[in-house]
């Protein structure tokens, strides 16, 4: 059964969880944005499909409805799709909208948060 994972890359170097790293190492497709460190993509298998959907305030390579469509399409096509998001998928990341779109399409999905800034800031202070 195919599945899409919304993986938060965390707030910086070393903030990706072990579960997130494991999913990247075993994914067949990664859909990623511009707010993450490119080095994370080196964890993906060489034959992994890579789809860039970069978004920053005022600049979008793909709008949110297009990203949702891409995620549904990938969820149908690939056994393991990782939607890799900078930071936390649910803090300004629109992860909730993406999960709702996947569920509405009948695609199995799971959220895998990275280390969020609320925790990282306190720990690193």
Language-model segments: which ranges?
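Anionic-ligand binding region
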Residues: 122-125
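Class I S-adenosyl-L-methionine
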Residues: 1-14, 18-115, 120
């Amino acid at each position: 059964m195919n599945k899409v994972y919304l993986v938060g890359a965390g707030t910086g170097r070393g903030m990706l969880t072990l579960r997130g790293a494991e999913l990247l190492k075993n994914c067949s497709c990664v859909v990623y944005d511009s707010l993450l460190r490119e080095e994370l993509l080196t964890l993906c298998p060489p034959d992994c499909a890579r789809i860039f959907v970069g978004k920053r305030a005022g600049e979008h390579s793909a709008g949110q409805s297009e990203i949702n469509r891409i995620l549904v399409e990938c969820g149908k096509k690939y056994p393991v799709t990782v939607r890799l998001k900078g930071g936390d998928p649910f803090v300004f990341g629109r992860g909730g909208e993406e999960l709702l779109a996947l569920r509405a399409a009948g695609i199995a999905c799971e959220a895998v948060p990275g280390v969020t800034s609320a925790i990282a800031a306190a720990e690193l202070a």
